[in-house]
């Protein structure tokens, strides 16, 4: 059996060889075995990345995208042992290294948020009862985002220099949805994200913040109903 220090050194050397794609023999490891490990790591990492980021690569030269993934494997630091987190690790790496421009990074953040909604452990109820006094919460599978660029209005075809606020969520049928939010939408959903509450209490809070809320109240009630129907807000889960 190898001494512990020697074993650690061998493991580190093997990891470095796989990272760098170095297929030279290493401490008894045949070049063919190293090549298999190297391909396996890249196939898994690249596969998870490409399944998450579908739209962003369409705005990038293929070779540049390929090089970014290789750069990540060679130089990135893993903060999570789970495969489903690889895409998020890649996004963080690209953000820290400023590998792509801010528009691309914003779109990548959006696509990664879609993945987060998909794999969220939150249970979205298909049916529920509520009334104006029911304490309601923002769905645990919903994410509020703000971006300095609009790629949603064009269905990801172009980047418009217009700030947007958006929501990405998963419904009870496990469909991932997204929508640009109005200021009233964003205010209501942000409010419920911070503190679950009833419609009556939210309306009362609105009265204390706005001098004359008469015209806003019916709009807020419509917005509330819209998000209840969309399964974005539902009775608080404890």
From Swiss-Prot:
Gene3D superfamilies in alphabetical order: 3.90.930.50, DUF2063
Cross-referenced Pfam families: DUF2063, NGO1945_C
Domain of life: Bacteria
Record-linked InterPro entries: DUF2063, DUF2063_N_sf, NGO1945-like_C
Name of the protein in question: Uncharacterized protein HI_1599
Organism: Haemophilus influenzae (strain ATCC 51907 / DSM 11121 / KW20 / Rd)
